[in-house]
Amino acid sequence: MKTLIARHKAGEHIGICSVCSAHPLVIEAALAFDRNSTRKVLIEATSNQVNQFGGYTCMTPADFREFVFAIADRVGFARERIILGGDHLGPNCWQQENADAAMEKSVELVKAYVRAGFSKIHLDASMSCAGDPIPLAPETVAERAAVLCFAAESVATDCQREQLSYVIGTEVPVPGGEASAIQSVHITHVEDAANTLRTHQKAFIARGLAEALTRVIAIVVQPGVEFDHSNIIHYQPQEAQPLAQWIENTRMVYEAHSTDYQTRTAYWELVRDHFAILKVGPALTFALREAIFALAQIEQELIAPENRSGCLAVIEEVMLDEPQYWKKYYRPGFNDSLLDIRYSLSDRIRYYWPHSRIKNSVETMMVNLEGMEIPLGMISQYLPKQFERIQSGELSAIPHQLIMDKIYDVLRAYRYGCAE
């Protein structure tokens, strides 16, 4: 990461896409997409997804590392070209506890990530815990971030410190996405970004972490990009120019969250304006969902009723029976809920792919289609971009490859923006 940031600060138009997903097909796609390039791939886990207690993926940081490395080995992607990151590392998962208890767990969380070899660490202590004022004072946020940084430094080896980098600040919704419709978004003021940096510098130095400050590579700010279930707020470069100009006087770049669904031109403009780390998650699993839905429609027409997977019906049944991952995010009416379950841009389906019933139904669908010759006309109907690539000889009409290429479409836009 440090080399990439140095190149950007030297005037090169270069950025990196941060893949925030634990889905094996998304990770496979991210690695396979850059297998034949010289680029490194940044894959990040969030604190609620992966933590010392397992998170909702039932993986510790060490488990997640091995999970990613196993996929890399299978794909033929060199492990040393993978950068592992930890996102929103702090009290996010334990906000219902008092600050002392939550921070104690947060310290162990950060240590677990660093011990597992994660080298990009987002120190995010911005969330209020039980008994805390809402919002927290910037000084309190910075002091808690310094505690987390001290924890990281205490377990990092000398070799790890050479690679270790920190991201500070937050200007994003709670990890997982917006819970309500958005109409506009507040762009971070330069004064607030400067205050984030100033308070963190003061807190780090007070804890004897002056050297660790040199490892802070980025600040999270809100450049004016966001999405909810059916709306996308697109990047307006002119609105972010004060931020773009301010960061030029520092050693750092910005990290932009929720950049999903922006245009490829917007990604290029974001990187130009020093938002050099672009995080993406739901857009990748949304593309995966689109591909699986398309293949399910194809299966319905090609496979006898008694042998079909019933994939779409299974997904719907499971999500309606177990609504805990979408209920507070989606509209309450039954028909509206169904539409959101299937097509929401926030893609809450991503939490359900590991469910045994859904996983089994998708596997059945894939087995059903693997041995079939899918008519080109059907691919044109349901996966038109992939049809074009089949026609030009770039792609084969194999279900797994069709899914990969659908996810590549998202990665292609980021590659354009992060041009190396």
From Swiss-Prot:
It holds the Pfam family GatZ_KbaZ-like. SUPFAM superfamilies: Aldolase. Keywords: Galactitol metabolism. InterPro entries: Aldolase_TIM (IPR013785), GatZ/KbaZ-like (IPR012062), GatZ_KbaZ_carbometab (IPR050303), TagBP_ald_GatZ (IPR023436). GO terms for cellular component: plasma membrane. Forms a complex with GatY. Belongs to the GatZ/KbaZ family. GatZ subfamily. Component of the tagatose-1,6-bisphosphate aldolase GatYZ that is required for full activity and stability of the Y subunit. Could have a chaperone-like function for the proper and stable folding of GatY. When expressed alone, GatZ does not show any aldolase activity. Is involved in the catabolism of galactitol. This is D-tagatose-1,6-bisphosphate aldolase subunit GatZ. The gene is gatZ.
